[in-house]
Structure formats: structure tokens, C-alpha cells
Amino acid sequence: MLNHATADVELTTFQGKDLIQNFIFFQSPLPTLIKMKKIKIIELASVLAGPSVGQFFAELGAEVIKVESPKTGGDVTRSWLFKGEKGNGTVSAYFTSVNWGKKSLSIDLSNKEERAIVYKLVKNADIVIASYKSGDAEKLGVDYETLKALNPQLIYGQITGYGLNNPKVGYDAVIQAESGFMSINGEQGANPLKMPVALIDVLAGHQLKEALLVALIERMENGNGKFVQVALIDAAISALVNQGANWLVGQNEPKSMGNLHPNIAPYGELFSTKDGRQLLLAVGNDKQFKNLCRILEISDIAQFSTNQERVVNREELNEVLSGKIELWASEELLETLVDEQVPAGLVTTVKEALDQRESHWFLKTDGLTGLRSFVASGFDRLSLSPPPQLGQHNQEIIDALD
């Protein structure tokens, strides 16, 4: 565990001139680099939101121990295989997405003797990450109040579906339905659509990362632990951003519009090129639109000269643009648009997008490839161990406690 008393840093400048036991700072032409080499984390979380936070800290150099129940076969996503997937022991493709760099401890928390192992770990831990619904952590004896008694400096971060006072089970798809996201996703007049990734889980994970980092900074200042909690429903509502503001400020209720944007045009529209590719435009200002018209040789733009006019006359504008864009080959047009700083891109498959990424954005080991959780530049990119088999590190972890 880290000793906050060694921390002597001016938090307002955060220039990295002081050596802090729980952070190592050093100067660089890029922003100050931070390694959390001595942070110890106990992960009592499963599925995606909580484990994504654990992997984030592992990528920063923290030691992350993932506690899993042998009764359930560990994290449920170990069994979430796509059709035709054979899996690798107790590791599925889904499980690998957020579990790199962790050690797996398979114990039954309902068993007093086995739960005592977690209590020993907590005494020297900095952070606990949990994803229990309301009341479950207390039943298992791993709630914040219980663990704080063992370690007053402990920071406890919990993901819930609906908050601490609502025992309803929260899954990403349900939250998408209840938060308004599905109502504005999909084509106009069609059935609501769920997003094809668990975006609410991802957003909640980011919210918890931020909360835990703030709690760590506070602890450097006052030496106190802290309980922080993020509900999936809250993370979803906060992510409505401009769509939420359209209602709160303008009383304009958001509705599904397909790819279209309620406030900007042409923004999100797809157009077919001469070679059959789909090109998306995301024009954000009048200068970009004028550049687009010059490239496409559109001279009569009187009814489209401002963004508000383009939003009002969207259908007429799209007809004009479609007739021009279909005359161009996709790569030639895209290159021209990029050169003239007109935001545009070709629709790309997931496979194509991943194949185009540079290798340093990936985690690789033993023939396995994964996506990094932390992608900001200016920091060391650490190599991580592959996602663990269930209970792979039991003996190592228990031996270290003796």
C-alpha cells in the first residue's frame, strides 16, 4: 500500500518536481508522465464497466487482482462466446476486451475462511473496484464500511445500475432503453435501436476512472480514503449532452433521425460515390461548407449559405450533394476534401478499422491481441500479461500473504 504521508506536491501546478511514493513523475517534452507502479487494486467487478477500470489502471502499471467466484465459473463474460467461438480455456473473446494485465484469484466470498483472504489483501490495497447491485456487497461482507475498518485509507469505487438505494439489476441494454438513447437511435419512424456496443458501460467506466483519480489526489492531500459510486443510468443521462440540452433549453424533444444531426447540416449524411462506397460528411461551419461547394462545383448556395438555412432546407441540399458526389471516385474525393479541411470519411468495417491501426495501439502477447483502454499519447505504453485463466494466480497471491 502507498503511504500518503510521503506525498509533498503542489497540486495546483502538478509539475512533477517532487517524488511521490505512489506516483513517479519525470520531465518530458510531452505532458508529465505518470506511472502508478505501486498502486494495488482489488477488483470485485464483472462484465464490462468495472473491469474496464481495472484494465485502465493495469495499463498505468498498477497491480490488479481480480477476485472471482468459482461457484459461477468466474466473471460471467468468460462464458459469453460468439457463435462458433471455441474459447481458450476459461477465456472468451469478450472477457479479453477488459481483463489484460490482471491476476485472477478464484475464491468464494460467502465462505468466511476464503473471504479472509480478501481482508488480508485489502489491508495493503489502495483501491477496490466493485460492481454489485444495492445490498449485495453487504451480504458478502465486502462493502465499503466493512473494508474501511480494515484500511481507513482505502478508496472504494462501485458501479451500480441505478444507485445505492435501488436493487434493480442494471445491464447496458436496459439502460439504453430507459435513458432515451434507443428512442433517438435508428431511422425516423422505425423501431428504436440499441447501439451495437455496450457504450453505457464504457461511459460509466470512464466516469469511475475519473472519480478514482480525483479520490487519489484528495488522499495525497488529506490522507483519507473515500467511497465513490457511479450508476449506469446517471452515466447515460449525462452523456445525452447536446440532445439533452435541446430539450432542457429549447423544449425540442429529440427524436430518431437516422444519421442526421438535429442542429447541423450536412452532418452525418451518407452519400454514394461512383465506385459504390459510402461517404459521410460532417460539415460544422460555413467555411467548411463553402470549401465543399467549391470542390463539388456547386455555385447556387443562396438557400444554404448558413447552417440554420441548411438545417431547414436539408432535403433539397442532400439532393444537390448526392448528384455531385456520385460523379466522384471515393478515394479521390476523400483526399480532396481532406486537403481542403472538409470533415469527411468513408464508411469502414470493424475489421478494416482495426487493420488500419498502428501496432502500438494494441496489446499483444502469446498470439493474442487486444485493444488498449488508455490511448492518450505522452505516456509509456506498458506490455501487459494476457487475460488470466480462472484462478490462475491463486497460489502466487496466497503465498505472498504468508
Model-derived regions, located:
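Short hydrophobic targeting helices and cationic amphipathic motifs
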Residues: 4, 15, 19-27
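Residue-level detector of beta-strand structural context in well-folded domains
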Residues: 94-96, 228, 269
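Acyl-CoA thioester-binding alpha/beta core of soluble enzymes
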Residues: 32-73, 124, 131, 150, ...
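Substrate-binding/catalytic subdomain of NAD(P)-dependent oxidoreductase enzymes
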Residues: 216-255
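N-terminal helix-loop segment corresponding to the beta1-alpha1 unit
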Residues: 13, 32-221, 389, 393-402
